[in-house]
Amino acid sequence: MLIIPAIDLKDGACVRLRQGRMEDSTVFSDDPVSMAAKWVEGGCRRLHLVDLNGAFEGQPVNGEVVTAIAKRYPNLPIQIGGGIRSLETIEHYVKAGVSHVIIGTKAVKQPEFVAEACKAFPGRVIVGLDAKDGFVATDGWAEVSAVQVIDLAKRFEADGVSAIVYTDIAKDGMMQGCNVPFTKALAEATSIPVIASGGIHNLGDIKALLDAKAPGIIGAITGRAIYEGTLDVAEAQAFCDNYQG
């Protein structure tokens, strides 16, 4: 299982939100590129970037920062989400050196777009499913749909999606642990690998994900915990690498 540091971009700075509320943000750095350097030097093997302004505006806003990070680390897998709603945007990021794009809102509102994107950019498409009480939320979490996460995930199985990033909104940024039972259920209900996100606080939460014994859970995204120092990236990755269960 990979430990994947999150860099959330708002107005060019690296921030963390609580439960997806733009008005409840903490700025951790005004230099996201050096923040990326910190996590890479700490031994991370993948980065998770989110264009928060893009998620709300429906198009990339912090694209220059994303490109700068991708150019600095050409061999590092980088996934970007937020405002990805056209094939042109995906092409822009792929050309910039980003390895994976995360389709969120558009995957819920136009699931056929996912199939189209997978066909155009095989192996590069991740679907981001953000949920509240098991139902999918969209538009920067401002809207909650009547669509159930597991039902939607199954729909993407035939499309060639490389992973699903599953975020439990109630847990995100709260440092109270992630929703292990639901993450496990999702990983077992679909053949698509799952990356857990939201609420990871410390090594105990990483252990809880590993203890779930769901091979489909391939990664854990962590944000506030690594910024506030309750989780160390290198230590957590070593723990995953050496886990015997």
From Swiss-Prot:
<dbReference type="InterPro" id="IPR011060">
    <property type="entry name" value="RibuloseP-bd_barrel"/>
</dbReference>
<feature type="active site" description="Proton donor">
    <location>
        <position position="130"/>
    </location>
</feature>
<dbReference type="GO" id="GO:0000105">
    <property type="term" value="P:L-histidine biosynthetic process"/>
</dbReference>
<keyword id="KW-0963">Cytoplasm</keyword>
<dbReference type="InterPro" id="IPR006063">
    <property type="entry name" value="HisA_bact_arch"/>
</dbReference>
<comment type="pathway">
    <text>Amino-acid biosynthesis; L-histidine biosynthesis; L-histidine from 5-phospho-alpha-D-ribose 1-diphosphate: step 4/9.</text>
</comment>
<dbReference type="InterPro" id="IPR013785">
    <property type="entry name" value="Aldolase_TIM"/>
</dbReference>
<dbReference type="InterPro" id="IPR006062">
    <property type="entry name" value="His_biosynth"/>
</dbReference>
<keyword id="KW-0413">Isomerase</keyword>
<keyword id="KW-0028">Amino-acid biosynthesis</keyword>
<dbReference type="Pfam" id="PF00977">
    <property type="entry name" value="His_biosynth"/>
</dbReference>
<keyword id="KW-0368">Histidine biosynthesis</keyword>
<feature type="active site" description="Proton acceptor">
    <location>
        <position position="8"/>
    </location>
</feature>
<dbReference type="InterPro" id="IPR023016">
    <property type="entry name" value="Isoase_HisA-like_bact"/>
</dbReference>
<dbReference type="InterPro" id="IPR044524">
    <property type="entry name" value="Isoase_HisA-like"/>
</dbReference>
<protein>
    <recommendedName>
        <fullName>1-(5-phosphoribosyl)-5-[(5-phosphoribosylamino)methylideneamino] imidazole-4-carboxamide isomerase</fullName>
        <ecNumber>5.3.1.16</ecNumber>
    </recommendedName>
</protein>
<dbReference type="GO" id="GO:0000162">
    <property type="term" value="P:L-tryptophan biosynthetic process"/>
</dbReference>
<dbReference type="GO" id="GO:0005737">
    <property type="term" value="C:cytoplasm"/>
</dbReference>
<comment type="similarity">
    <text>Belongs to the HisA/HisF family.</text>
</comment>
<dbReference type="GO" id="GO:0003949">
    <property type="term" value="F:1-(5-phosphoribosyl)-5-[(5-phosphoribosylamino)methylideneamino]imidazole-4-carboxamide isomerase activity"/>
</dbReference>
